[in-house]
Amino acid sequence: MLGMIKNSLFGSVETWPWQVLSKGDKEEVAYEERACEGGKFATVEVTDKPVDEALREAMPKVAKYAGGTNDKGIGMGMTVPISFAVFPNEDGSLQKKLKVWFRIPNQFQSDPPAPSDKSVKIEEREGITVYSMQFGGYAKEADYVAQATRLRAALEGTATYRGDIYFCTGYDPPMKPYGRRNEIWLLKT
């Protein structure tokens, strides 16, 4: 636990590598098309709980893993954004299922420490191309749903993306009160 606190206060923060392919602006929605690198990710999946409740369960597990709760006792530092996959119903509401993805820092990509918590899994993920839109505040499930609706409306007729999944991302620690950065990522098809 001390490693996690030390790491969150003094540790490094690495940005998940991506390249901006294009930018757009429609109906007061600014967005980017990005190619995001793949790699190894620590993941936690939670089902049968609303998104906000599932996040309160999953995020500390990922943070503890990054902070040193692993077989090597190494605090790795964080990568941003932390993302989580959500699965919309036909009406736009979200299913009671999510999967948190934490990209393991580059220094540990070739040989990541094994998680001590069995609910944390290490997975290899291919690169993805996304349509991304940024927004601020302390985001909750309703905010992600509303922002995803705005991004879909802005992309209507100009882009194709998956409708069965999208990513919600955050860049800031929970204790940051102002200037928070969140994003919605729709997966390009």
Curated annotation (Swiss-Prot):
User: Gene3D superfamilies of this UniProt entry?
Assistant: Regulatory factor, effector binding domain
What's this protein's name?
A: Heme-binding protein 1
Domain notes per entry? Forms a distorted beta-barrel structure, with two helices that are packed against the outer surface of the barrel. Porphyrins are expected to bind to a hydrophobic patch on the outer surface of the beta-barrel structure.
InterPro entries from the entry?
Answer: Reg_factor_effector_dom_sf, SOUL_haem-bd
Q: What is its main location?
A: cytoplasm
Q: Which domain of life is it from?
A: Eukaryota
Give the UniProt keywords, A-Z: Cytoplasm
In its UniProt record, a GO molecular function of this protein is: heme binding
- Could you mention a single GO BP entry for this protein? circadian rhythm
Q: How does it assemble?
A: Monomer.
Family to which this protein belongs: Belongs to the HEBP family.
Location comes to: Cytoplasm
- Origin species, per record, is Homo sapiens (Human)
Gene Ontology CC annotations of this record: extracellular exosome; extracellular region; mitochondrion
- What would be one Pfam family of this protein? SOUL
